Amino acid sequence: MFKNKDSVGGTLLVIILLSLACSIIVAGSAVLLKPTQIEQKELDKQKNILSVAGLLQPTTKNSEIKTIYANNIEARLVDLNTGDFAPAQPGFDAAKAVKNPAESTALSAEDDVAGIRVRANFAEVYLVKNDAGQVTQVVLPFYGKGLWSMMYGFMSVQPDGNTVNGITYYDQGETPGLGGEIENPKWQAQFPGKKLYTADNQVGLYVGKGASANAEHGIDAISGSTLTSNGVNNSFKFWLGQKGFGPFLAKLKAGVLNNG
C-alpha cells in the first residue's frame, strides 16, 4: 500500500500496528495477572488479620499463612443495622457493596464523622478461635479519612466486646514520619488492654496529646500529626458507634457468640 517505507503514511502505519500490538500484550497481561493479584490481595488480608490477632511470628512464611488462617479464623458476616450475624454471601466485597445503593447506606453529614460518605449494610468480622474451637478474639475492619488519605485498619477485640487486643493499619497515605506513624508497632503497642466504651456506653477510646494518662481509654497522639489523630478518633467514633459495629459489640457483650 505504501511503497515508500519512509513516507508519512508508512510511518503512521507502523506506529498504529505497534500501538495495537502493545495494547493486545498489555490487555492480555492484565487478564493473565488478575488471578495472581486477587490471590495476593487475599493473602495480604489474611496476613494482617493474623498479625493483629497475634498469630504471626517473625519467622512465619507466606506459604504458611493460608494454613494458619484456615485453622484459626472464621469469617462471619454481620448486619450492621441490627448487629446480628447474617447468612454468608460468597464473594462478599465491602468495597464493591458501597458502590451499590441496594447494598449500602448513604450517611448524613451528622452521621458521617469518619468521612466515608457511604457504608455497606454488611461487614465481615473474623472470629479467632483456639484449638478447642472457643472464640478468643474478634477482628473488626475499620477505615476513615485522615489528613491526606483513607486509612484502613483492623482492630482485635476480646469476647467481652469492650477490651482491645490490638490494632493495625495496613493501607494509608499519611505523611511519612508524622501521621504515617500510625503503622509504627511502637505506637500500636499502646492499644492492648484499652477499653472501647465508658461506663455509660459512650465510645471512650481516643487518641490525644498526653491521653495515655487516661489508663482506660487514652492513646498518646503522634507528635505533629493532629489532623491524622483527629481522623483516627473519628474512625473510632463511627465504627464503634451505632452506625458501625456498636450494635454488634453490644450483642457480643451479651454473649451472642455463645449462640451465633
From Swiss-Prot:
Disulfide bonds: none
EC category name: translocase
Assembly and interaction partners: Composed of six subunits; NqrA, NqrB, NqrC, NqrD, NqrE and NqrF.
Cofactor dependency: FMN
EC number: 7.2.1.1
Catalytic activity: a ubiquinone + n Na(+)(in) + NADH + H(+) = a ubiquinol + n Na(+)(out) + NAD(+)
Organism: Pasteurella multocida (strain Pm70)
Cross-referenced SMART domains: FMN_bind
Keywords in alphabetical order: Cell inner membrane, Cell membrane, Flavoprotein, FMN, Ion transport, Membrane, NAD, Phosphoprotein, Sodium, Sodium transport, Translocase, Transmembrane, Transmembrane helix, Transport, Ubiquinone
Membrane-spanning residues: 12-32
Any GO molecular function: FMN binding
Membrane topology type: Single-pass membrane protein
NCBIfam families the record matches: nqrC (TIGR01938), PRK05346.1-1 (NF003746), PRK05346.1-5 (NF003749)
GO cellular component, one term: plasma membrane
InterPro entries, A to Z: FMN-bd, NqrC
Known function: NQR complex catalyzes the reduction of ubiquinone-1 to ubiquinol by two successive reactions, coupled with the transport of Na(+) ions from the cytoplasm to the periplasm. NqrA to NqrE are probably involved in the second step, the conversion of ubisemiquinone to ubiquinol.
PANTHER family reported in the protein's UniProt record: NA(+)-TRANSLOCATING NADH-QUINONE REDUCTASE SUBUNIT C
Family in the record: Belongs to the NqrC family.
Annotated positions of the FMN phosphoryl threonine modification: 226
Gene giving rise to this polypeptide: nqrC
Name of the molecule in the record: Na(+)-translocating NADH-quinone reductase subunit C
Location within or outside the cell: Cell inner membrane
BP GO annotations: sodium ion transport
HAMAP family from the UniProt entry: NqrC (MF_00427)
